[in-house]
Amino acid sequence: MKSFKNKNTLRRKKAFPVFTKILLVSFLVWVLKCSNNCNNGNGSGDSFDFRNKRTLAQKQHEHHHHHHHQHQHQHQAPHQAHHHHHHGEVNHQAPQVHQQVHGQDQAHHHHHHHHHQLQPQQLQGTVANPPSNEPVVKTQVFREARPGGGFKAYEEKYESKHYKLKENVVDGKKDCDEKYEAANYAFSEECPYTVNDYSQENGPNIFALRKRFPLGMNDEDEEGKEALAIKDKLPGGLDEYQNQLYGICNETCTTCGPAAIDYVPADAPNGYAYGGSAHDGSHGNLRGHGNKGSEGYGYEAPYNPGFNGAPGSNGMQNYVPPHGAGYSAPYGVPHGAAHGSRYSSFSSVNKYGKHGDEKHHSSKKHEGNDGEGEKKKKSKKHKDHDGEKKKSKKHKDNEDAESVKSKKHKSHDCEKKKSKKHKDNEDAESVKSKKSVKEKGEKHNGKKPCSKKTNEENKNKEKTNNLKSDGSK
């Protein structure tokens, strides 16, 4: 600081004082005002400024002993200001006034005697400024990084088969070990899908998945037709799923057939995360099924076409896992939705732990996991089939929200009639009519996953294929 005294000050005696006086006063006022506004709660901003000024004052004191009383004031002002500051908003003007006066004094004082003080003070003011000026707010949102892709392990039990399946989220390949147990159909999953938020891979649409496993169908008695093949009783069957897509008639829907599907344009504005380009023509009709899932969470990352499994296979949505596994809908189809679904984006892998089995097992209301539709989807309520018809309008809205997720394309009356509570029934209904379409998917996909399927089942498959051709065409 001393170096300023001899050279610089003499050279700039004329312009420097006036300029700095103005600058300093306004600067002090501004700092004070700002720190009062920004940091009312904690005196930290002020104490920082004043501490700096006090040290300056002491330094000045050392250099120039002839201005004791001026410094006396300078020392006082900070304490006064502090005092007011800590006692709330009322006295905020006081520190400002004091400080301004003293700032001016000081400026005058320097103006006549030694300008070298000004420069350092300016610098120190600048240093003191950011703490009082910018509240320290971390604006960065930290998201937990999750392992990319990952596996979903779930079990399906129906009649005498028990499959433990593990499906790779990325390429849709399943592996499973098949056990034989006497059990009615049940679906349980070990833990939710995990998807890497940063790479924006799309896991399966959990909402659609849940809707396809309502756990307890008794179509046979209701339809008066012959008993269905096992795989047609499975809520996860492709028939049922595609029936949701293609809107085949059932009791609740007035409009039927593909006409009832509401295709969503690729650039749909409503914040669903479809990546428009990721759909080719053949899968356009799958678009939007279940996509509402992403809406509630505002996670709109676009589908990332680079994520597709085999080159040319258009990714997961082309992979229609074969019928044998009971859960045979193409996982990735409504690909946007997995982003927003609570499972894929917002839960860590082990959060729900491996207790999934117990939780989902006999269709206990398993899901603490997903507050949304899942409790209802899994609950046993769907056992009564009239439930479908009398679905309460009370839940209409929820239902719409939920059911649009995976049923966008069914006619709207359909959606309205269903209450979230009976989500499952909705599937129950659809299974009825969905049997047929499942075949469609399966036919051009003839792989059987873990299929040690019995002959009886294959026979039944043929049976329902015929059913399909009558029913759905």
From Swiss-Prot:
Composition skew (Basic residues), residue ranges: 57-87, 108-117, 406-422
Disordered: annotated segments: 57-143, 347-473
Cellular component GO terms, alphabetical: extracellular region
Subcellular locations according to the entry: Secreted
Comp. bias regions, Basic and acidic residues: 354-375, 396-405, 423-444, 453-473
A family per Pfam: EKAL
Glycosylation sites: N42
Keywords: Glycoprotein, Malaria, Repeat, Secreted, Signal
Matches recorded under InterPro entries: EMP3/KAHRP_N
Low complexity biased stretches: 95-104
Signal peptide: 1-34
Entry function: KAHRP might mimick human histidine-rich glycoproteins to anchor host thrombospondin or a parasite analog in a binding complex with the endothelial cell receptor.
Name of the protein this chain belongs to: Knob-associated histidine-rich protein
Organism: Plasmodium falciparum
